[in-house]
Amino acid sequence: MPSATPILPRQQTAIVAEAAGKLRIQHNVTVPSPGPMVAIVKTAAVAINPVDAKMLDYSPVPGAVHGYDFAGTIVSMGPNTPAHLRIGDRVAGWVHGMNAVEPNVGAFAEYVASPADLILRIPDEMSFNDAASIGLGLFTAGLGLFHELKVPGSLSDPDGLEIAEDERFVLVAGGSTATGTRAIQLLRLAGLRPIATCSKANMDLVHRFGAEHAFDYSDPECAAEIRRYTGGTLAYALDCVAMADTTQLCYNAMGRAGGRYVTLEPFRSAIAETRPLTIEPSWLLALTVFGRKVDIDGEYSRDARPDDHKFAVELTVSVQALLDQGKFDTHPIKVMNGGWDGVKEGVDTIRTQAMSGQKLVYPV
């Protein structure tokens, strides 16, 4: 394993935003420097997320490097980085792509400047392609479940959960999404009882990641079936689809006593107002885990949330232990060709085609 810091080039190839809905490949983008608690990663693979297209379409930052999920090799580290990380480590992570505050920090680049305390070392047997699928889905699921939804249970002490079996149910709507499979797996590892909605075609997938039971979201009786299965005790729902239909389904599936509902987009207030006294709704933006101000237009803007970053660091430690023990699996991927040209096309693909049960990954 290399012990000396290699000399980084001054410029690199990266995909940057040009205008709303438009990206370009640029060959003279400045390589970021390793500041405090920052690791520079030589990118080996990147993954495409729906947010890549959404942010480009509705909140572009011209000239900023785009992309969130990556995997690669650490080639440089700044001061105060975690002692367990070394130059030469194979790692996975994610960053705030197309960031107005840090325009040279994005995953769609030859070199990525990543917060070192949110990086995961990957096992030797895990490919960079598989590892590239981890970042955004993992931290969205973790933040949603343990920080926002406040489910009982702990990844570090799953056997210490002292609640009745019928109080352990957690519904994951959209269980076959990349965030959904991460959520199901985390819940199972924390000693809880994940149940999921998905299509019939993806039921085997959600069962493989640990769902106790899967429900066909297209069945008109879906919510009633969930109530019957849980005995009317469901008190936690994570909505990974974030549409009006799934909000309504989650509300209808929850028990009479209510509970908490968390989604990944602003929820429909008209639905929330149907059970204002029993269900506490909220929605999250995973970008807050970096502990910095999120400079995005409208209701997606956030002040810095140090508590979210503290939680994310703790989650990283817990998931690192699971990876080291071989207990954490990755979401199914579809490996694509084309390098940076392919990545650019992939963002267009995710805009028009739903990726059911898999994630597009590009070796670069």
Swiss-Prot record:
SUPFAM superfamilies: GroES-like, NAD(P)-binding Rossmann-fold domains. NADP(+) binds at residues 51-54, 176-179, 199-202, 217, 264-265, 355-356. One of its GO terms (molecular function) is oxidoreductase activity, acting on NAD(P)H. Keywords: NADP, Nucleotide-binding, Oxidoreductase. Pathway: Secondary metabolite biosynthesis. The keyword Oxidoreductase applies. The keyword DNA repair does not apply. It holds the Pfam family ADH_zinc_N. Its EC number is 1.-.-.-. Substrate binds at L136, G137, L138, F139, T140, A141, G142, L143, A286, L287, T288, V289, F290. Monomer. PANTHER family: HYPOTHETICAL OXIDOREDUCTASE (EUROFUNG), TRANS-ENOYL REDUCTASE APDC. Belongs to the zinc-containing alcohol dehydrogenase family. Trans-enoyl reductase; part of the tra gene cluster that produces terrestric acid. The clavatol biosynthesis cluster cla and the terrestric acid cluster tra are both involved in the production of peniphenones and penilactones. The non-reducing PKS claF is responsible for the formation of clavatol from successive condensations of 3 malonyl-CoA units, presumably with a simple acetyl-CoA starter unit, and 2 methylation steps. The esterase claE probably collaborates with claF by catalyzing the hydrolysis of ACP-bound acyl intermediates to free the ACP from stalled intermediates. This is Trans-enoyl reductase traG. The gene is traG.
